[in-house]
Amino acid sequence: MRWHAVYRRFVLGRHYRFAREALVPHFFDALTAYAMELARLGLPRADTAVTALQELRTLPLPSFTGEVEDVFFSIYSQLAEHWGEEVAGAIRRGLSRNDLDLTAFRAYLRDRVVALLGDFLRLRGAVLRVAGAHAGVPLVLRTHHRPAQPSTLDHYLLGVEALLERDFRRLQQTLDTLDRCPLGASALAGNPYPVDRRRLAALLGFAGPVENTLDAVASGDYALELASALAGLGTSLSRFLTDLLALAERGAFVVGEGLAQGSSFMPQKRNPVVLEHARIYAGQLVGGMGTLASLNHNTPFTDLNDHSTGVLEPLTALLGSAEAALELTRVALEESQFEPALLLEELSPEVLASEAVDLLVRKGVPLAEAYQRVQGALPGVRPELLGVEREELIAWMSLEGFFARREVLGGVGPKARAEAMARARKRLKEDRKTLAALRARVRLARRLLAKGPEGFQAEEGQKATDHQGQVEGQEHQEEPLG
């Protein structure tokens, strides 16, 4: 078939180049797993197709010429050319591009999300390391853009890390939907051959299949969930970066030499541009949600390009922006330094005025009256207008006293901060273990897939042996003693 030049340029060629660059390994994985399942069912030439696919994937895929419309038919035509039509046709029994494409898409996006979670963990680790290195360093925090109360740098950074941890959790939770395998759904009604869809999912390292076969090819919520999680991340990062830029503006945060740029005209300039670029990437994440929602909005619940091939390029761009935002923020933290003296630049008696109110209340003055008396003693919180000794007021309003009185859970007190740091480090360690287990599951599946049917059967046999040993061990433990 001769495709129109405009269609070739903007659709077929563009999609083929993207698939050739990003999706080919996932197509081969899905086709190999499917051929292995057909071979298990005893369908003719399926075992030969497994071998052919394993050999073919070592060769470069041809560039787009317009002779075939997509990567699947490029693989199919090569199979037919080198191994014959019967072998090529073997993998098409019951297989639709609907379930095949979405299996490859989900596997690709899953790998990208897993990699991004790793970047996320590195940033959280950097935040905690910088917080630990600046434990107890005081600074003045603001509310409504005005100086409010003292805190410490580690207390502030622990708050930022807590926000980022929730963003990490939301991104991690996208795998509950994304890490499910559509293969075996065929066009939409299910495969006409009795393939084991749970086995297919396991072969490809997925957590399990998308159960309903229409849902497997029709749903686009996996893309929406991912875009939503990335938008949340972009919002959180932009707030942190805005704070760092405000500190950099007054010299309290000095960006590392390799992350700042000068001016082509003003020789004195040393601009903290790494923070600006990180915030640009974070902003792109916020805008992505609208794009993905539009691609799903007002579309019928069935297989469509809108929420299959249509979401791949925008999601890929968003994942690239997320990686850039996380990594730029991380190196900005690791390669820059805070200036403690300038962090306290806004410290004044007024910043501790609430402590004077508390002191009067503790002496029996009604709160409303104490509040008015302190307001009347401003600026400077003059002790003679409060009816307290100067030395007592100075001691009460010291930073040390302020922090010591705030040993509540999550507070700025030294003990509370140390305990919060220990909890944050423990959560980070657990998240690293969880991510490592997920990576190991996918790596194992790919290793077994590369070995062919024998490798997967051997693994299943080992699992059965291990399970039997566990059962026997439990039975032995349950035997009555004596």
What are the functions of these language-model segments?
Residues 43-44, 206, 365:
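Helix N-cap/coil-helix junction residues
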Residues 1-180, 184-190, 195-197, 262-263, ...:
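A helix-coil-helix interface module used to build multimeric assemblies
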Residues 462-479:
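Intrinsically disordered, low-complexity, charge-rich segments with an acidic bias
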Residues 97, 210-214, 349, 357:
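A structural signal for small-residue-enriched, beta-sheet-centric alpha/beta enzyme cores
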Residues 1-30, 64-68, 87, 251, ...:
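Glycine-rich cofactor/substrate-binding loops
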